[in-house]
Each structure stands twice: as C-alpha cells, then as structure tokens.
From Swiss-Prot:
GO terms for biological process: translation. Pfam families: Ribosomal_L23. One of its GO terms (molecular function) is structural constituent of ribosome. One of its GO terms (cellular component) is ribonucleoprotein complex. This is Large ribosomal subunit protein uL23. Keywords: Ribonucleoprotein, Ribosomal protein, RNA-binding, rRNA-binding. PROSITE patterns: RIBOSOMAL_L23. SUPFAM superfamilies: Ribosomal proteins S24e, L23 and L15e. Transmembrane segments: none annotated. It comes from Saccharopolyspora erythraea (strain ATCC 11635 / DSM 40517 / JCM 4748 / NBRC 13426 / NCIMB 8594 / NRRL 2338). One of the early assembly proteins it binds 23S rRNA. One of the proteins that surrounds the polypeptide exit tunnel on the outside of the ribosome. Forms the main docking site for trigger factor binding to the ribosome. Belongs to the universal ribosomal protein uL23 family. The keyword S-adenosyl-L-methionine does not apply. Part of the 50S ribosomal subunit. Contacts protein L29, and trigger factor when it is bound to the ribosome.
Amino acid sequence: MIPDPRDIILAPVISEKSYGLLEENQYTFLVRPGSNKTEIKIAVEKIFGVKVTNVNTINRQGKRKRTRTGYGKRKDTKRAIVTLSPESKPIEIFGGPAA
C-alpha cells in the first residue's frame, strides 16, 4: 500500500543549488527517509499534477552537535531531485526560475 503522497514529500529544499537546478526543470524536495524513488515519483505527480521523468535521491547524514552534557546528533535526512518532462508545466512552489 502506498501511503498518502503528502507524507512522502515533506518540504521543498531552498538552497543556491536547488535554485540553479530550476532552469534545468529539476526540483529538490526533502522526503521521508524510508521512501523509494517510485513512491517519490508517484507522490510528486499526484500532488503537483506534472509528469516526472527522473528521480535522483541523496541520503544525508545528520551533523554531530555538542550539547551541555556531551555530543548529540541531528537526524539523518533524504533529498530527492526530481526532473520533470519538458512539456510539463513548472511547479510554482519555488516561485519559478530566477531571472
């Protein structure tokens, strides 16, 4: 059973690299760490109504942070770089490519 698409896509990634990828019709999202590429593709197509051609994923290890009592660790995250088909409409969640 595929979970709700909004449980898979957590948030868009706002960074210099993700804004640069907008011109290549690629969008970067923070996704649930247990999700696979097929689930991510289906979720993006359902939420935004676009056609996805490719999904690349990145597993990022959480940073080690010092606390008052010793060391802790931020949680691990997973990012997905989603490539849309050329005839697909752009996703307006990022505000479009920077001009």
